[in-house]
């Protein structure tokens, strides 16, 4: 489950929403240079995601337990671990418009100055939203 929260940047004063985490059926990656986000659907990833689910000790998400159990029992492909999943999934994405790459381990950035989360504080006037 992902979330979106409002922040204020200490470095430049920009108010913005930052998203983190994917959902039950998609992953959310950030650009390693500017922090823009890119969603990638598990269906789009096809065999990459199926191989990852096959290698998990349990379901990817409780809400898709039955589907994941079927994948683990019936999918004929070789399982992959999390690191390989991330590497293969990242390779399917085009570069960001800024020239950076979308990565699972890249952090969100302030859209005003590209500062990292340690430079922000929660905006008391903004909402906090969870999504799947």
Range-by-range predicted roles:
Residues 4-6, 26-28, 90-95, 99, ...:
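Residues immediately within or flanking Cys/His clusters that coordinate Zn2+
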Residues 91, 97-98, 105, 111-114, ...:
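Extended, compositionally biased low-complexity polar/Lys-Gly-rich tracts
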Residues 24-37, 106-116:
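Cysteine-rich micro-motifs
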Residues 1-24, 28-31:
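General detector of N-terminal leader/presequence modules that precede the first folded domain
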Residues 18-21, 83, 97-100:
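A general structural-boundary detector
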